[in-house]
Amino acid sequence: MQTNELLDKIFRGARSQNGWLPTPVPDSKLRELYDLMKFGPTSVNCSPARLVFVRTEEGREKLRPALAPGNVEKTMAAPVVAIVGYDTRFYEQLPDLFPHNPAVKAWFEGDEKVDFANTTAFRNGTLQGGYLIAAARALGLDCGPMSGFNNQAIDQAFFAGTSIRSNFICGLGHGDPEKVFARSPRLSFEQACQLA
């Protein structure tokens, strides 16, 4: 694939989906997706993202009560819904993830460092969520990211008793081109950027 084709596939031609074709996404594709996105950089390789790939009827029914009314139909129709979460105790994995500096775990441990740890987890987990979308599109999947849901309800249903918190959800599969909205405008370089 040529560079421009790939950029179109991931960015210029890709669209947030509002409807889905009934084409299944195999578990092997979800593994391939994670095994690609995990290579995106994070601060001190902290890798705080934690994912739940909701793909069964039982999982969907756990998810349904947390969704905003306007998001129920399209979310329930997605072959897979990724819950993109972040682990606020990500630093427990740092001895394995950042082995050349064993002291780095201590940067985040302790009551006085909770805010720093939580901010780091949220920021880098969000970054990894962006990698998930880019990787999914590169692998030929469409995405429907959204934040129209009750985080506390998701956390209770899927992460109770853990240090993981939900950030956003993202439908994955093959989108229905008939249900894609017209592309909304984007800010120009001059509106969004400065050269310093």
Swiss-Prot record:
A UniProt-annotated Pfam family: Nitroreductase
Listed cofactors: FMN
Assigned EC number: 1.-.-.-
GO molecular-function term, one example from the UniProt record: oxidoreductase activity
Keywords: Flavoprotein, FMN, NAD, NADP, Oxidoreductase
Entries under InterPro entries matching the protein: Nitroreductase, Nitroreductase-like, Nitroreductase_HadB/RutE, RutE-like
HAMAP family named among the record's database cross-references: Oxidoreductase_RutE_HadB
Record family assignment: Belongs to the nitroreductase family. HadB/RutE subfamily.
Protein name: Putative NADH dehydrogenase/NAD(P)H nitroreductase Reut_A1586
Species in which this protein is naturally found: Cupriavidus pinatubonensis (strain JMP 134 / LMG 1197)
